[in-house]
């Protein structure tokens, strides 16, 4: 049986140089190849004209360049584009491109589904299937960059920012998320500033400490409740890592980080008459007083079967004013792509149903296998 080829999109620069050293090649050759991959989107070794023919043949024999394919896409009236990305075995994840006047952000997924079961999030209701590989994470950026034309002028703004805020909890897939973000930041990779790559977490505290030791990127933290009692319901991982532990971990990360400029972004979804009273705003302000942050209020984006409603503009406004009285910078997030279910908390949609059908099929296959054995 032939040896499985190495997918070069799975390798950060350190791993790429190690591979080239194993082939008897100098490190700069690995850097050249990465530029072809990530600066120009080239996937055919024969097109890499500054790499000699013998090395191109060695690469073709041992390696491949495989990114997940775009299955379909929908474009919102506001220019937001939601992509369904095929990651094999009947599984898909969603990736969202959000253009603005001065930048274009890509919201990237880290897992198929999510194990955290946040009660206001469509992805959380999908259940967890598996972690994405490095190539499946960076492949989302690579494929969408191809869609946008890579270095060609197609009229669409090129990707300037990446947020790990798609499907999944990134800190539960650190082994693949860290090298993927390394590629995003690398000058020979996507060459993004560390302040333009953001990881969002619901509070896996030990993994947050590991991230701080390995990498410096912007951090967004999903708080969503001003106390443990309510957060236990909205964000069940709070039962394992309550707010005091999470906030201490956030402060440790801030102390190590330059990307965050001394403060993180707090994400707080606004749920009608659940977490949006002025009393709860006072409680949130007191909770966050020792953790340097700006606060991003996110109007809830309903999805089919959701038990929650979106806070009214007046309730959001009152909540925001209380926080500002305490001196916090407060931003009310503009909802983007909600007409195509691409807004915050809506990712999953039909994919959730397909994933559940796949899980059911696997269960049936396992039952058949057990019966036969």
UniProtKB/Swiss-Prot annotation:
Residues 100-339 form the Radical SAM core domain. [4Fe-4S] cluster binds at residues 114, 118, 121. The active site is at residues 94, 344. It comes from Shewanella baltica (strain OS185). Belongs to the radical SAM superfamily. RlmN family. The gene is rlmN. Pfam families: Radical_SAM, RlmN_N. It comes from the Bacteria. Binds 1 [4Fe-4S] cluster. The cluster is coordinated with 3 cysteines and an exchangeable S-adenosyl-L-methionine. S-adenosyl-L-methionine binds at residues 168-169, 200, 222-224, 301. The lineage of its organism: Bacteria, Pseudomonadati, Pseudomonadota, Gammaproteobacteria, Alteromonadales. Reaction proceeds by a ping-pong mechanism involving intermediate methylation of a conserved cysteine residue. Disulfide bonds join 107-344. GO terms for molecular function: 4 iron, 4 sulfur cluster binding; metal ion binding; rRNA (adenine(2503)-C2-)-methyltransferase activity; rRNA binding; tRNA (adenine(37)-C2)-methyltransferase activity; tRNA binding. Specifically methylates position 2 of adenine 2503 in 23S rRNA and position 2 of adenine 37 in tRNAs. m2A2503 modification seems to play a crucial role in the proofreading step occurring at the peptidyl transferase center and thus would serve to optimize ribosomal fidelity. It is found in: Cytoplasm. This is Dual-specificity RNA methyltransferase RlmN.
């Amino acid at each position: 049986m032939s040896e499985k080829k190495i997918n070069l999109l799975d390798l950060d620069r350190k791993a790429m140089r190690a591979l080239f050293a194993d082939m008897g090649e100098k490190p700069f050759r690995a850097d050249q190849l990465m530029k072809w991959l990530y600066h120009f989107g080239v996937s055919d070794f024969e097109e890499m004209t500054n790499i000699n023919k013998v090395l191109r043949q060695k690469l073709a024999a041992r390696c491949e360049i495989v990114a997940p394919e775009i299955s379909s896409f929908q474009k919102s009236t506001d220019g937001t584009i939601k992509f369904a990305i095929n990651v094999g075995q009947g599984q898909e994840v969603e990736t969202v491109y959000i253009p603005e006047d001065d930048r274009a952000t890509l919201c990237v997924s880290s897992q198929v589904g999510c194990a955290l079961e946040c009660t206001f999030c469509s992805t959380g209701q999908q259940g967890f299937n598996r972690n994405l590989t490095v190539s499946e994470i960076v492949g989302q950026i690579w494929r969408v960059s191809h869609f946008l034309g890579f270095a060609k002028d197609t009229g669409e703004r090129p990707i300037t920012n990446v947020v790990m805020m798609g499907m999944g909890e990134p800190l539960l897939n650190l082994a693949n998320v860290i090298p993927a973000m390394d590629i995003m930041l690398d000058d020979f990779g996507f060459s993004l500033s560390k302040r333009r790559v953001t990881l969002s977490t619901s509070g896996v505290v030990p993994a947050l400490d590991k991230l701080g030791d390995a990498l410096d990127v912007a951090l967004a933290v999903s708080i969503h409740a001003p106390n443990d009692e309510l957060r236990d319901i909205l964000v069940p991982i709070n039962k394992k890592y309550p707010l005091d532990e999470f906030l201490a971990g956030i402060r440790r990360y801030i102390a190590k980080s330059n990307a965050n400029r001394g403060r993180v972004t707090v994400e707080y979804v606004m749920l009608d008459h659940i977490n949006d009273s002025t009393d709860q705003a006072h409680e949130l302000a007191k909770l966050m007083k020792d953790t340097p942050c700006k606060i991003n209020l996110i109007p809830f984006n309903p999805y089919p079967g959701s038990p929650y409603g979106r806070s009214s503009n007046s309730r959001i406004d009152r909540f925001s004013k209380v926080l500002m009285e305490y001196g916090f910078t407060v931003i009310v997030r503009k909802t983007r792509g909600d007409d195509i279910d691409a807004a915050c908390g809506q990712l999953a949609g039909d994919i959730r149903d397909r994933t559940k059908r796949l899980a059911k099929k696997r269960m049936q296959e396992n039952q058949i296998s057990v019966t036969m054995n």
